[in-house]
A protein has these predicted regions:
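Bacterial Sec-dependent N-terminal signal peptides
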Residues: 1-50
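Extended soluble regions of mature proteins
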Residues: 42-299
């Protein structure tokens, strides 16, 4: 029997070398109570962010509510806020909730103190996308304060613009559809803001995307706030960065979900899983554990 069927997983104790100066001992709640409630992931841990070089100028700040399902068959969704800083030639996209947690840690007087684990569902990705050529620098935080993976991507979109229209927050929008990396999408974009961008790495339309959903219902971005606000788009300075290719990243991302214990140990992280009674489980049971896998990019 699979270990996820025989245990109500409540805690992962993580001790030892986490390649982080934040803490020497961490215990994170993993609220994965049963097979039918397999919605939890390893939490994305806050980190200290330092401002780096200025990459460009933003004209807008846009917030999207982002609902996603950790497992395709799940009835429940987790929610995040994805913020983009939008300029004519550059867009930066990241989890606003995670940025708030990062900011709290960055300005904390004692950065080694025990910290609150953020809510689940916060995206561990952030993006810098050059709108002149589509070149996108992708950053991914590996679980539990592991190294950060960075790779270059140049996504392309083959949108079909339809005649359907609707109004979103006072903006007239038009419907476009496409298949992108294994998923079918519907996007509502506004020509009133003629910048080819959207949440995360999406774009490729003659206007800003205000709403985006996968047809299978597992990923959905809706406009939460749109402000015309000038400012610098700043590159964050982070530590423990490992540059990889996109295929290398995809291989890691799949392994950390399908074989999390082995993958994290290969990073130098020592993981001690427990059942809901607080008992450490056997090695054989630990290596059988999996995390729900429903990436926004299937290919």
């Amino acid at each position: 029997m699979s270990v996820v069927k025989s245990f109500a997983w409540r805690w992962l104790a993580v001790r030892g070398s986490l390649r982080s100066s934040l803490m020497k001992s961490l215990i994170f709640p993993l609220l994965l109570l049963s097979l039918s409630e397999m919605q939890a992931q390893f939490p994305t841990i806050p980190m200290v962010l330092q401002p780096g070089k200025v990459l460009g100028k933003a004209e807008y700040v846009v917030d999207y509510s982002y609902w996603s399902k950790m497992a395709p068959q799940s009835k429940d969704s987790v929610e995040d806020i994805i913020r983009i800083e939008l300029g004519q030639t550059l867009v930066k996209s990241y989890s606003y909730k995670l940025w708030q947690a990062d900011s709290a840690l960055t300005h904390a007087p004692d950065k080694s103190a025990r910290m609150r684990v953020p809510d689940e569902g916060m995206s561990p990705f952030w993006y810098y996308r050059d709108l002149t050529n589509g070149r996108t620098q992708v950053w991914y935080r590996t679980p539990l304060s592991g190294p950060i993976l960075s790779y270059i991507d140049t996504p392309t979109f083959s949108w079909t613009i339809t005649g359907s229209k609707k109004t979103i927050s006072g903006y007239e929008t038009q419907l476009a559809t496409c298949v992108f990396r294994g998923r079918s999408y519907e996007a509502w974009f506004t020509p009133s803001i003629p910048i080819s961008a959207g949440p995360s790495l999406f774009g490729g339309l003659p206007g800003l995307i205000l709403e985006l959903r996968s047809v299978d219902g597992t990923h959905h971005f809706t406009l939460d706030a749109l402000q015309k606000r000038a400012g610098d788009i700043v590159e964050w300075k982070v530590r423990l960065v490992k540059t990889v290719s996109r295929p290398q990243f995809r291989n890691y991302y799949e392994r950390v979900h399908k074989h999390p214990i082995q993958t994290l140990r290969s990073n130098g992280q020592r993981i001690y899983p427990q059942d809901d009674q607080g008992n450490f489980i056997s090695e054989a049971e630990a290596v059988d554990w999996q995390i729900p896998y429903n990436p926004i990019e299937l290919e």
